[in-house]
Amino acid sequence: MSDAAEEQPMETTGATENGHEAAPEGEAPVEPSAAAAAPAASAGSGGGTTTAPSGNQNGAEGDQINASKNEEDAGKMFVGGLSWDTSKKDLKDYFTKFGEVVDCTIKMDPNTGRSRGFGFILFKDSSSVEKVLDQKEHRLDGRVIDPKKAMAMKKDPVKKIFVGGLNPEATEEKIREYFGQFGEIEAIELPIDPKLNKRRGFVFITFKEEDPVKKVLEKKFHTVSGSKCEIKVAQPKEVYQQQQYGSGGRGNRNRGNRGSGGGQGSTNYGKSQRRGGHQNNYKPY
């Protein structure tokens, strides 16, 4: 692999693709709930497979990995910190020394066609995962890479929504009056801009049941207190942060990688710059 590629910045600080995610540092990588995952058919180990998206490297992407995205699979691993030049074959060849690799994939940026610096592998035997984790350091194409266990996230019911484009002057009473017609409200969050000490133009509403959310989402826009508001499902902070893996995060800790400015393949999985107080809890997708 060329040395030049090693000096280029890489997008590897929080991600999700086809239902797979890298978790915050110190936690196991997870896969999102049904509400957060992109629409795709899923199947058990003995069922069918999902269709691989475009932009895959070295041919077809791992159907078996995609098919098990919402299921626990002890043989599946997330691999972060990959070089742009690392191919699917390179990834498979490296991990084959730990056991038989039945499937692997490298996630690609659909806009640039470049690797996003992370991928997934699926071992035939889960004992191979433990062998990988037992090794203190892994290097591939001149870079320190970071393999972790991949785990499925539980499908919790969706009860929380994001309401954007709301007039900051709209009272909680008016908000509750409008959305209360869809179902019983458990809580309303009114984020404050810490610099201006004023209400922000969005709120989060948690219903006691899941059905009201479905009713609200039948329309994308709602008029609340004279404002045309956009409604979306609110995502847990962990899911939002992982989506930043491929959306502009540039490495912070190279952990022994060449140079300190390139940042390709940062290991700060799940960490993103805060752009607003609402990221403390939820973010729409």
Swiss-Prot record:
Omega-N-methylarginine found at: 250, 255, 258, 275
Biological processes, Gene Ontology terms: chromosomal 5-methylcytosine DNA demethylation pathway; epithelial to mesenchymal transition; mRNA modification; negative regulation of nuclear-transcribed mRNA catabolic process, nonsense-mediated decay; negative regulation of transcription by RNA polymerase II; positive regulation of DNA-templated transcription
Locations listed in the record: Nucleus; Cytoplasm
Modified residues (Asymmetric dimethylarginine): 275
Principal cellular location given in the protein's record: nucleus
Modified residues annotated as Dimethylated arginine in this record: 250, 275
Phosphoserine: residues bearing it: 87, 247
UniProt crosslink position (Glycyl lysine isopeptide (Lys-Gly) (interchain with G-Cter in SUMO2)): 136, 208
Annotated SMART domains: RRM
A GO cellular component annotation in the UniProt record: cytoplasm
Region Disordered, annotated ranges: 1-65, 239-285
Transmembrane portions of the chain: none
Keyword Ubl conjugation: yes
Domain RRM, residue spans: 75-158, 159-238
Quaternary structure note: Identified in a IGF2BP1-dependent mRNP granule complex containing untranslated mRNAs. Interacts with APOBEC1.
Protein name: Heterogeneous nuclear ribonucleoprotein A/B
